[in-house]
Amino acid sequence: MAAQAAPAEELSKLSVEETKPVSAAANGNDSNAESGDEEGEEGTTPAAGAAKKKKKRKPRKKKKAPTSQSEPPRVLVSQLFPNKQYPKGEEVEYVNDNLSRVTNEEKRHLDSLASNQEFLTDYRHAAEVHRQVRQWAQKSIKPGQTLTEIAENIEDSVRALTGHTGLEEGDALVAGMGFPTGLSINHCAAHYTPNAGNKMVLQEDDVMKVDFGVHVNGRIVDSAFTVAFNPRYDPLLEAVKAATNAGIKEAGIDVRVGDIGAAIQEVMESYEVEINGQMLPVKSIRNLNGHTISHYSIHGTKSVPIVKSNDQTKMEEGDVFAIETFGSTGNGYVHEEGEVSHYAKRGDAAKVDLRLSSAKSLLKVIDKNFGTLPFCRRYIDRLGQDKYLLGLNNLVSQGIVEAYPPLVDKKGSYTAQYEHTILLRPTVKEVISRGDDF
């Protein structure tokens, strides 16, 4: 774990006082000391003579704060933006009936007020951390790496850039990982991260979804991309990226989520990919959805389908949405399968009288370190907890903690994912996680 860097405002206070000069004799340099023969001249002693020849040291220059990110990322983002003016996301005007919002004076005033709210600064801070970490990850992820290495590289970087290692009680609730790094390969579409002892290695022919969240004060930025090294999968990745952008374009205040799903599906399923001489259609995974994001909760109350539906739920001003799409060369439908790694405490969990002592103690750890933020077993491990699985399973069975098993399509198929977080501001939608990469 990288050492925490000092904030820029603290660095600016660390001006170095001019060092008091030290005599050459005091430094052990006898050649510059006055000789004993001069002692009688004007009553000057050798020490006094030496004092006359004190050398002034040049004042040390103040250490400059970093102005660019390191590789791997270890520089606090707050140091790179000491005035907290973090970059805005992509601002997109509303279409059709919502165009009037841009010229409405009252709406502009409300948007100005919203821009000053602390939550927007926190969101942009989290988004900048996500951008810097993922852009490095896209360059650094290579075949031959273990999934554990990839996940820990991303997570260490997020913690370094937010300045919160998450090892002190409550520290991870201030800022850091919004949810565990998902590294779902090939037919596995979501909710896979390595548990302790996992030896899985990324292969040249794999298609891996990289899905991780960053939060600052509970404002979660959720964004994902897909890594593939074999160019034959390019049409699959292009289909999903284009479908996500279609969903973002369609999204807006008063827009029905069913219409967004139709727009996503139309784009997604216009693509096909050739694998082993066979042309395969790209299908939207119909039982996976986008969703709203709430304070300290990755899944809010609204969902955004990625296929056409009759869902009449409307997006509303002030909503925060994760627009994510999944494409598959398989059935276009996922089911739960495999060892669980992702968990989250339920926000609506009823109070239960726990009889198992290990469950009681683990719940305290979860409350103090994660709250309702999702976590994985590796996060519990790094807090020094052991022999907790029985207690964790008990919390799941009691309905206090939700388990999220891996979601998979049929074996032999390939899946891809792209995702952005958007804010529905009064006059524009801000694609808060947009970057030069996607």
From Swiss-Prot:
Its EC number is 3.4.11.18. Residues 51-65 have a biased composition (Basic residues). This is Methionine aminopeptidase 2. Substrate binds at residues 191, 299. GO terms for biological process: proteolysis. PANTHER family: METHIONINE AMINOPEPTIDASE 2. Cotranslationally removes the N-terminal methionine from nascent proteins. The N-terminal methionine is often cleaved when the second residue in the primary sequence is small and uncharged (Met-Ala-, Cys, Gly, Pro, Ser, Thr, or Val). Residues 10-20 have a biased composition (Basic and acidic residues). The lineage of its organism: Eukaryota, Fungi, Dikarya, Ascomycota, Pezizomycotina. GO terms for cellular component: cytoplasm.
